[in-house]
């Protein structure tokens, strides 16, 4: 699909950057020779806009071998960022998709500045080509035909091999993020814990990873009472899923991802209202993020050791379901007083984290659609983070900045630990109250990470979008897939 060339050839569409300070850049001047100065007139008349994310279409009318040019406004160079580029190109690829373009090219060097080199631009272009044109997978009987972009050419004076590599990496990042989106969007009667495990096994086998899928009996033997408690009310069997990627000869410096895999959450006996229950098929967004990251890792083969653990079940009501006031024993041996059955994700993660440590994880990053509290605190565009290790958090933060997936650190104070340890009947309680809800949830999970370096990512606000945006339609976003993969790719770098 991707090609790299030094000269412009025949294409259906060519994408060109426009900055406010350089309305007559060398790229525009060169094109304007064929247009006999008409582009300059369009710029002066503001028919070609340099405003951020403005897209201006110009037909060549036979003056060149290119059918249409799409000029992409990027605003001022001083405010030009990777986020600006991602949004602008995402919108551009949506426009090309709507026009049913099958052969497009990008004047890569027109997007290059002192801040962003050609490799950065190539990576982002290939990544957002997939993200921006992602289409919601539905179960409607009337299927519409979709025209795909079949050929995408980067026009650049830079080294072709390096640009091709960047295009490939970007494409893999975008495709894997879309894989995660599709998982999150699937209905709960289709994506059960069993189906999620089957998907994970297929992924592991495709990329030659080791894997384990623990059944209920094995979980009982290992004492995974927290996950099993959440599963008590369900007719669907629980799964503890583990994918193991060995990127080094020695099993050291193992990064452990733990993704919440609650395939549907009614709240259990602490029942959600109807409006709060609709959409809870997406409560396995953390699991999807982890699997998406493992798809990237399997494709690109970084020299790191990685474990992905997914505790999976649904949380439903029945005569056998767990109840408020129950006391359960986790895999770690710590006992938990259940004060809220709708705080089930942290219970599943507790056993997931302990199992990841048992498999050899030296660093832990858990990802979960955990609390509504984080949405109140940070909104729908920022993931909440907590940690017991600032050095590890800094690496996660740097990865998130590279991928433009915003995160913000929330605190853990000793008084927060005291609140989750406040129980007359057990070592911990799973829900100290609504105050500081997001912090309480993360603090609870940290009790199981113990001294292992750990970062908690609450994606409740970022996992899904209520409306269409530059990088995709309404629905699942694939939050943290690219950040997790980038963390692994960059791990340990100075």
Swiss-Prot record:
One of its GO terms (molecular function) is manganese ion binding. Mn(2+) 2 binds at residues 260, 265, 283, 344. Binds 2 manganese ions per subunit. Its EC number is 3.4.11.1, 3.4.11.10. Keywords: Aminopeptidase, Cytoplasm, Hydrolase, Manganese, Metal-binding, Protease. It catalyses: Release of an N-terminal amino acid, Xaa-|-Yaa-, in which Xaa is preferably Leu, but may be other amino acids including Pro although not Arg or Lys, and Yaa may be Pro. Amino acid amides and methyl esters are also readily hydrolyzed, but rates on arylamides are exceedingly low; Release of an N-terminal amino acid, preferentially leucine, but not glutamic or aspartic acids. It is found in: Cytoplasm. Its cofactor is Mn(2+). Its main location: cytoplasm. One of its GO terms (biological process) is proteolysis. Mn(2+) 1 binds at residues 265, 342, 344. One of its GO terms (cellular component) is cytoplasm. It is an enzyme of class 3 (hydrolase). The active site is at 272, 346. Belongs to the peptidase M17 family. Presumably involved in the processing and regular turnover of intracellular proteins. Catalyzes the removal of unsubstituted N-terminal amino acids from various peptides. This is Probable cytosol aminopeptidase.
